[in-house]
Amino acid sequence: TTKKDFMKRIKLLTLSCLMSLSLPSFAQFSPDHKVSLDKGDIKSFIGDKESKGERKVYKGDELTTIGMPVGGICAGQLYVRGDGTLANWWIANNAYNTGYGIDWLLNFDTPLGPWKVCYQTFEPMSYIDQGFKITVNDGNKTITKELNKKDFDDISFIGEYPIAFVEYAQKKQELPVRVSAEFYSPFIPLDAKSSATPATIMKYTVKNTSDKKVTADLEGWMQNLVCIDLKGRADGMLQNKVIDNNGWKSVYMDMRVDNLPAKTAGKNRKYEIFDNFESGNYSRWKVEGTAFGRKPASGEQCNQNNFGGNYGNFLANSYTNYDKPTGKLTSRTFTIRNKYISFNIAGGAHPGKTCINLVVDGKVVMSATGNNNEDFLPRNWDVSEYKGKKAYLEIVDAVDGDWGHISVDNIEFSNSPVDAPTITIDKSHAYFGNLALSVFDGNATGTADDSENNLEYAEAELGKKLNGALTSSMTLQPGESKEVIFVLSWYFPNRPLSYKGSEWNKPLPPNSPAIGNMYANWYNSSLDVANQLRENYAELSKKTHDFHDTYYNQTTLPYWLVQRIMMPISTLATETCQWWATDKFWAWEGVGSCEGTCTHVWGYAQAMAALFPELERNLRERTDYSVSLQEDGGILSRNGEHGILIDGHASVILRMYREHLMSKDNFFLARNWDKIKRSIQYIIREDGNEDGLIVKTQPNTYDISFNGANTYVGGLYLAALRAGEKMAYIMKDTTTANYYKKIYTAGSENTMDRLWNGEYFFQDVDEKEYPKYQYGKDIYQTEAINKALQSIWKFNWTNDVKAQSEAHLPERYYAHAGEPGLFICTWPYSKHPGEDGVRYRDEVWTGIEYQVATEMIKRNIIDEGLAIVKGIHSRYDGKKHNPWNEIECGDHYARAMASYGVLQAVQGYWYDGPKGIIGFDPKIEKNDIIGFFNAAEGWGNISQIRKNGKQTNSIEVKYGRLYLDKLQVTLPEGMNANIVKASVNGKVIPASLTNTNGYTEVSLNGLQICANDKLQIDFE
């Protein structure tokens, strides 16, 4: 088997449940199978795959949901929105659990306000006051505009991760200047440290478009957000300081927790009780429905757990009969005379459905929900704007499912808010740290409080707004442009150890022992971050732009495709990914959701291994083959905890081989070989009789266990054996290699004999003994593999999920009516099993879509594979869903980083670092293509031109270096090259040619190619 064939098989053998969960039958289609055989005009859908196409410019309502991560990898989470404002400020170890993705967990409250997550249409949230404005004077008049959608109605956004480009424009131009901006953090593949800088660069360009000289002031302001999530619950004094850094300016923001002024708020507070329900009746309320009963509840109801914090003996509580009843309480009308309405609330977090509402003039003007727990928390509404108006309250329960209840108590009117319970914090608290807004302009001016000019120091109590600001001034002649570079840097070193995470929609526990952030080993403050960034700005900016240009501008692949492939890779710069101060990479499945860099979900992700292989090797050696490796060779699924998931276990073995291939030598493999053999022996024992089939219980990524022989787990098992065989040969362990090969061969043959029905692979299971979700299909012989992939296209992909989703309601929605998608499971020839079917059967996961598309493209089922990817692109289009946030069990789901496999497939690219081999067999643009390559020590462009009976292949290194001993390519049909000419930068070098196993191999005698060198090989 050639290296090329082997890598195809390895990838293919990881195909998921899609090919293992359809009842094998040749009957007519089941009437409840609603996936149409008519896929539409897919050629029009994917566009011209032989040309690059237009750069995507987002405008108008396409800007709605945009939130592109622009901080460092593993350094928190910060978005730039479609209008160039920043959002989702999870840079202070303050992220929330964004799972589980089900409809009643999409919205919740935070101390800063309502929050939204997962697969719905919304603008990313920001409760931090931050922005930029420009003031321009042309000698006649002065105009000031904020750089956001409020003042610019024709904004353009181009998102090419890691760089976002924003152009500020008005349909009716008022300004004599044009303003544009770039937002990014250093992102340099193969340099994880530089790419993990806790900072965002905001480079503004101002161009005078008039025929007059103008002056312009560009001001950036930023709110001090230190410990802002603790406002109302902790005491501290926010501090802003303007600092002159010898050639650049900063506003440094932190907080002190000592020498605080004595608190007087809350003492002798006067209030009027509207209702605390201690009367034991609803005399002040109109009762509708049955949820709230005929009288107030006396505490928690039957089967209501963890209830506490209510006032007195009675309260309004709609938890009755397991959350099934619904109803509403409507208060008597009252006149608003005080500044605040305060109350205690607990229960469900369903906005508008489990809530208390304030109604003024017939409209709900304020609303609050519970937080999906039973702990009462005080809430304060500032109703001063409605003073003197008539109003009434509604307490609503309109949900009959999970958390379908609301509890309210102690409603008060007052001119001062109820104090929330306070906690004592110090500098070790997870949220404690500092940030800095800087401008690389020594002549800039600054103020510590933007309500006054030129203040060098300002302070405010935690919970009150304190904004610092910097202004850069310029004079522009007609047609002249100037750049101003602002940097937002942060330093929050006390990341808590959150192995267990939190409940859905809750903040990650801040009080766990600190594990720290890796960047705290490199910097001592946010000012230090900004200073080092300034000192190295030219180099870091150039390398980031070099990568951007190499990947986006120099390649000829369809623009939409390269853009989509890179979009989920921004997950590395979200709170899904952490790099601990102990130098350990650790990650969730999605932001705050499902802990422990789990073996099964992360087994799909391909991007980090290609772009930052040191972090994948870190994961293998510091987790999978460290705390997770058991004495018997089993690999625990979640950072040394939980059980062994057999698909994840096999994928770890495969990834060890992948990490070896992305290494420059054999040292990584050699130092781990004994542990690898132990883990392979474990999965062989799961086989039992070495026939290459696993029939015993198989826990896996679907949060269930399979039983019986199948080709989801079975394919991964045989792929792991095949990888083990390859690694054994490298280690000169021939006996072990032959042993693995024997089992692999038996398994491949037995699979074809027992599990192939001529159309797809099925599962061999005793339905009487095991659960009914065990049905199957998958891979092995080439003809069978291709047929099975075509069956997936036929039975699982649709250009509109509406019919199938309405017939078989998914547990969670990741594709809505009118959107295309690939269903995890269908039963085309038998009745859909409903709840007896495999879990998540009716869902659509982008990670699996990328994986299937990768395998289709590798096997020349190209249009269909591209259509699957284009389907993802059409769902995450900006209008409906954030293009940079692919959802599964939580935001920024790691499985979606399988997208990088599509790039490797469409380019027909393979790489063996220790052997110095690159293969290139593009599936599209064969006659004229420029692609992107990544290797152990370098990256750049790889190309192929066919013209006049000749072929030229080139490799241009843009970063690092490349060791290349052999280049394997495919020549056009009918071309039998016998002459090869190789040159580096035009200088001829020795090379020899061999035609073997369907490709042409050029031997280059261990060539070393450095940055900016170009290798060219001409075939005749």
Which residue ranges define each predicted feature?
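Extracellular carbohydrate recognition and processing domains
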Residues: 359-391, 396-406
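Non-catalytic C-terminal accessory modules of carbohydrate-active enzymes
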Residues: 74, 85-87, 93-101, 105-182, ...
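Aromatic-rich carbohydrate-recognition surfaces in CAZymes
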Residues: 106-123, 130-139, 522-540, 578-584, ...
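The feature captures the catalytic groove of carbohydrate-active enzymes
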Residues: 193-195, 201-203, 428-439, 446-459, ...
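Short beta-strands within extracellular/lumenal beta-sheet-rich domains
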Residues: 313-337, 376-379, 470-471, 951-953
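Extracellular carbohydrate-recognition regions
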Residues: 263-294, 417-418
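Acidic/polar, glycine-enriched structural segments that form the non-catalytic walls/loops
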Residues: 29-51, 57-58, 62, 165, ...
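Active-site core of glycosidic bond-cleaving carbohydrate-active enzymes
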Residues: 590-633, 649, 674, 701-704, ...
